[in-house]
A protein has these predicted regions:
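Beta-rich ligand-recognition domains in immune and ubiquitin systems
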Residues: 1-222
Length: 222
């Protein structure tokens, strides 16, 4: 890819970045609101640890999914991939192959190194992946991110998270029937953020992952 083409693509992605990056206003969400039944991966909660794999057919062309479908990297080198309405073309994201419309589930994502932007969470199957993306729960996205050195919950407006350190593992907890979505530090079990109850209306949701301008990778566990 020529330098000019890379510059143009960076500009397009940068426009998406500007659309979805943090808003400085305080948001009406609260940390510490997670009830006992949304604490993830504990025997008393009857949560199932989901064994996720990544779906390459949804991956942005600059995201490289490993052969075992368990990790994803960003490289500033566009792959030759088949065009598809399922594929992210602007937001540097990839989804899980698995989808869910019931049950209590949890999974962990290891953050290897850090860079400009990473995010993890869940997304409605019908949520926009290209064009005008409403990048928060109104548009079917629930998650946490680190962008420009700040940890945030992807709310409207964004909620800044005050953390003592950048988590090495992020644990995602989903209770589909109760509409509970919570995020934890996978090493300490400290709650990072819990979203207000969501109504999925029976629609399937996928695990969602984002990396942009970053030399590290996201690893799925188990």
């Amino acid at each position: 890819m020529s330098d000019r083409a890379i510059k143009n693509l960076n500009l397009r992605i940068g426009l998406i970045d500007l659309q979805v990056r943090a808003v400085s206003e305080p948001a009406p969400y609260h940390i510490g609101s997670c009830m006992l039944n949304c604490i993830p991966c504990q025997p008393a909660t009857n949560s199932i640890t989901a064994n996720l794999t990544l779906d390459p057919s949804t991956a942005h062309p600059w995201l490289y999914v490993s052969q075992d479908l368990k990790s994803v990297r960003w490289k500033e080198m566009k792959q030759q991939v088949n065009a598809s309405p399922l594929r992210y073309e602007l937001l540097a994201s990839v989804l899980s192959q698995e989808s869910f419309n019931s049950g209590k589930l949890c999974w962990e994502v290891e953050v290897v190194e850090e860079g400009e932007w990473w995010g993890v969470g869940i997304v409605r199957e019908s949520a926009n992946r290209n064009g005008q993306i409403l990048f928060d729960p109104r548009g079917g996205y629930w998650g946490v991110q680190r962008i420009s050195g700040k940890h945030q919950a992807i709310t409207h407006p964004r909620t800044n998270l005050t953390l003592s350190h950048s988590p090495r593992r992020i644990r995602v907890s989903l209770d589909y029937s109760q509409g509970l979505i919570a995020f934890f530090d996978g090493d300490t079990n400290a709650e990072l953020f819990t979203f207000p109850k969501a109504n999925f209306a029976g629609e399937k949701v996928h695990a969602w992952f984002l990396i942009y301008k970053w030399n590290g990778q996201l690893l799925l566990h188990p």
